[in-house]
């Protein structure tokens, strides 16, 4: 590959990642603005279960209602945490929302030739990962682990006329978009560079057994940084090369952690927390993928 052709490939991949991700970032920041202006701390306190296990389950299942990609889920989760949602419930929501929503599950069903087993494995493992991690975090951390746990001037905005609330929603969405947008651009560029200059054949050569093939597919998912609505179509193209377990690892891990949303997490949360969270995700997704047969 010549320098010119590789640059053109990098450029096209970079732009395609941005085009794919920006609509979901917009959805995420708009929902974040709506939560800020229309949802009060009192409302959160009323609906959130006090029991830690029920709170984690509530957060995980709430992901069904939000057709959010992993690109847009960080701003929503951050806003919910600022509104008083416990960390364990917020993280459970953050991990499941990009996977168990109907749009993603339907695209998985179509991509794998109407195989319900793949849908159940993907949704089931995602739910299990989020529940286990949520419970662990409920014992490990007492605060929300945000870098900026409080935002002066961002309280009690839920009072005012509808027009004032809509104006506030728009202002918050714009601020949030520019806040997370720079990390999306950096992440998209790194992902494009790795896709251009790291050969897929190198990764394929490493995956010779169940453990290594799952790790390779998780690494590939991290590098490719695909949105969860389309990643199943890429995963299905590896069906003849990799086991179903490693494909499920690709589908679950990639929707929870990739280059662009890692940078967004580092911008929102404390670094130690992000490191621990990703460690938990890697270990539990890997263990779960080894149990998948088919």
Curated annotation (Swiss-Prot):
A GO cellular component term found in this entry reads: plasma membrane
Could you tell me where this protein is found in the cell? Cell membrane
Task: Give TM regions.
Answer: 15-35, 54-74, 92-112, 117-137, 174-194, 215-235, 247-267, 273-293
InterPro entries, alphabetically? DUF318, UPF0718
Highest taxon listed in the record's lineage: Bacteria
Please report the record's description of how this protein sits within the membrane.
Answer: Multi-pass membrane protein
Keyword Transmembrane helix part of the UniProt annotation? yes
Query: Quick check: keyword Transcription in the entry?
Result: no
Keyword field: Cell membrane, Membrane, Transmembrane, Transmembrane helix
What is the predominant subcellular site recorded for this chain? Answer: membrane
Q: Check the record and name the PANTHER family matching this protein.
A: UPF0718 PROTEIN YCGR
As for family, the record states:
Belongs to the UPF0718 family.
* Name of the protein in question: UPF0718 protein YcgR
Taxonomic lineage of this organism?
Answer: Bacteria, Bacillati, Bacillota, Bacilli, Bacillales
Gene designation per UniProt: ycgR
């Amino acid at each position: 590959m010549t320098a010119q052709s590789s640059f053109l490939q990098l450029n096209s991949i970079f732009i395609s990642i941005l085009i794919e991700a920006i609509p979901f970032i917009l959805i995420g920041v708009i929902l974040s603005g709506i939560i800020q202006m229309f949802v009060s701390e009192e409302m959160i306190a009323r609906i959130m279960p006090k029991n830690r296990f029920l709170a984690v389950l509530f957060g995980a299942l709430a992901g069904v209602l939000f057709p959010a990609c992993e690109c847009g889920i960080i701003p929503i989760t951050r806003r919910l945490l600022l509104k008083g949602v416990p960390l364990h419930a917020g993280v459970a929501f953050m991990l499941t929302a990009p996977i168990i929503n109907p749009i993603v599950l339907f695209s998985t069903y179509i991509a794998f030739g109407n195989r319900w087993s793949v849908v159940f494995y993907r949704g089931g493992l995602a739910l299990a990962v989020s529940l286990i991690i949520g419970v662990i975090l409920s014992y490990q951390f007492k605060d929300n682990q945000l870098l900026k746990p409080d935002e002066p001037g961002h309280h009690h905005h839920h009072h005012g006329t509808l027009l004032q609330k809509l104006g506030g929603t728009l202002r918050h969405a714009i601020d949030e978009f520019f806040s997370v947008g720079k990390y999306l651009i950096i992440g998209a560029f790194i992902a494009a560079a790795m896709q251009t200059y790291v050969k897929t054949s190198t990764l394929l050569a490493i995956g010779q057994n169940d453990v290594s093939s799952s790790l390779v597919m998780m690494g590939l998912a991290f590098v490719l940084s695909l949105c969860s609505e389309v990643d199943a179509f890429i995963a299905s193209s590896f069906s003849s090369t990799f086991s179903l377990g490693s494909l499920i690892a690709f589908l679950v891990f990639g929707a929870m952690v990739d280059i662009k949303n890692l940078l967004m997490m580092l911008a929102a949360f404390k670094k130690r927390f992000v490191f621990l969270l990703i460690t938990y995700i890697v270990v539990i997704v890997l263990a779960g993928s080894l149990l998948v047969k088919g």
